[in-house]
Amino acid sequence: MAYAKLGRTSSQRKALLRDLVTDLIINERIETTEAKAKELRPIVEKMITLGKRGDLHARRQAAAFVRNEIADVESGQDAIQKLFADIAPRFAERQGGYTRILKVGPRRGDGAPMAIIEFV
C-alpha cells in the first residue's frame, strides 16, 4: 500500500488525517498542502461512500474515524450527522469522484505547494 508519510509518525499522521476529514465535512472546502490533499482524498471518498450506505454499521465505522465536532451551532448538528444527512444524499447518483483538488500558489514562508480540496 503506497502512501505519503507527511513527515510524521503513523499515529500523528492518522490524527492529522482525522482532523482534516472532519474539517472538510464541516466546512466543505479547506486549504492545505498538495501532499495532504492527495492523501486526504481517498479517505474522504470512503467516508462519503459510508454515508451513502447509511446503515448502522456504516454510521459506526464513520463515527470511529471522524471527530465528534459540532458542524452547525444553530441546529446542533455534529460532523457525522452532517455527513449522513446533508453530504451523502447530495452524491446519491454519483459513483465516486466526490472531491476536487485545485492547486493554488506556493505558501508564503516555506514555499510549500498549496491546494484547495472541496466537494464537487
Curated annotation (Swiss-Prot):
One of its GO terms (biological process) is translation. Pfam families: Ribosomal_L17. Transmembrane segments: none annotated. GO terms for molecular function: structural constituent of ribosome. GO terms for cellular component: cytosolic large ribosomal subunit. Disulfide bonds: none annotated. The keyword Ribosomal protein applies. Coiled coil: none annotated. Keywords: Ribonucleoprotein, Ribosomal protein. Belongs to the bacterial ribosomal protein bL17 family. Part of the 50S ribosomal subunit. Contacts protein L32. This is Large ribosomal subunit protein bL17.
